[in-house]
């Protein structure tokens, strides 16, 4: 059974009842709930009678409690070190916890949380992505990683396919399944470069808990400033510099000068949370090598 097959299937009426019964959040007559996009979970935007907004998150039936606990802990850690504006905050349930439990019509148990709402438009829908906005993105990720420094949780030290530090295992396992010979040859060539030039130096780089998924639909923007980031489901204890690498990888897409976009993001990150000499040297070496691969 896949994660999608275990996704929750609650109606908007049931979501309103969960918010009320578990968290004491009474949805107003004109406040939704409004379903939000999600493949494996179920999210609803709520508004109460006073206009206050929150997001109800009903987890996949396969989601581990410990991972949600780790996410909530990270959100609270960030708030205590950099203020609550960077990311949503878990709201307290009637029983004093921040994670409740509900049972679906199929009998499966789902963990449920209520998070504060952050206003903003997804970066993907904000144009143009000029140097200032990309540097702002990098700066935001730097502030986030700085706020996450010192946070840890056993559940985040996990085997996870989207962790860049574990990329060699994932690519090595699946590259032979690429049907197109040309694509497979390209991946094998790049993978060979990665194994020889990059992998040996990763272990010595700075490690810590990272967000891990700064894609342009998770990053929110308001008035040309990054207002927050969503979806901490890919959090993992990994290479800290992977966070800015992921943000830069999304930022370069469809850009006429992709390396310029990367430079803008990295510059903003470095100004907010300086990269170490070893991290900069590794990036320079990989970039120089990749241009000749």
For each of these PLM feature ranges, what is it?
Residues 132, 275-287:
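All-alpha amphipathic helical-bundle segments outside canonical DNA-binding/catalytic cores
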Residues 241-274, 288-293:
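Active-site activation/catalytic loop segments of kinase-like enzymes and analogous catalytic loops
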Residues 58-109, 126, 131-135:
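A conserved alpha-helical element in kinase catalytic cores
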Residues 96, 108, 112-126, 169-177, ...:
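A glycine-centered beta->alpha junction motif in the catalytic cores
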Residues 94, 125-185, 205-207:
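A cross-family kinase active-site recognition segment
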Residues 11-26, 150-153, 168-212, 274:
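An alpha-helical support segment within catalytic cores of ATP-dependent transferases
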Residues 39-49, 55-56, 90, 195-242:
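Active-site acidic catalytic loop and adjacent metal/ATP-binding pocket
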Residues 25-47:
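ATP-binding glycine-rich phosphate-binding loop
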């Amino acid at each position: 059974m896949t994660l999608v097959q275990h996704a929750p299937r609650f109606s908007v009426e049931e979501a309103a009842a969960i918010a009320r019964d578990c968290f004491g959040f009474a949805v107003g007559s004109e406040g939704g709930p409004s379903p939000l996009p999600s493949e494996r979970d179920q999210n609803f935007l709520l508004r109460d009678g006073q206009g206050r907004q929150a997001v109800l998150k009903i987890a996949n039936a396969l989601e581990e409690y410990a991972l949600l606990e780790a996410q909530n802990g990270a959100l609270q850690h960030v708030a205590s070190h950099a203020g609550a504006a960077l990311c949503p905050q878990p709201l307290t349930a009637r029983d004093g916890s921040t994670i409740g439990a509900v049972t679906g019509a199929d009998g499966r148990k789902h963990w449920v949380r209520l998070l504060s709402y952050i206003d903003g438009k997804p970066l993907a829908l904000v144009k143009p992505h000029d140097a200032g906005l990309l540097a702002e993105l990098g700066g935001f990720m730097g502030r986030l990683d700085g706020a996450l420094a010192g946070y840890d949780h056993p559940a985040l030290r996990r085997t996870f396919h989207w962790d860049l530090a574990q990329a060699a295992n994932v690519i090595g396992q699946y590259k032979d399944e690429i049907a197109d010979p040309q694509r497979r040859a390209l991946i094998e060539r790049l993978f060979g470069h990665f194994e020889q030039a990059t992998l040996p130096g990763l272990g010595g780089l700075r490690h810590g808990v990272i967000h891990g998924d700064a894609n342009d639909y998770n990053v929110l923007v308001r008035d040309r400033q990054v207002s927050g980031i969503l979806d901490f489901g890919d959090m993992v204890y990994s290479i800290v510099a992977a966070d800015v690498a992921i943000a830069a990888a999304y930022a370069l897409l469809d850009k006429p000068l992709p390396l310029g976009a990367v430079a803008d993001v990295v510059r903003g990150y470095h100004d907010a949370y300086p990269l170490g000499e070893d991290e900069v040297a590794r990036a320079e070496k990989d970039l120089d090598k990749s241009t000749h691969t």
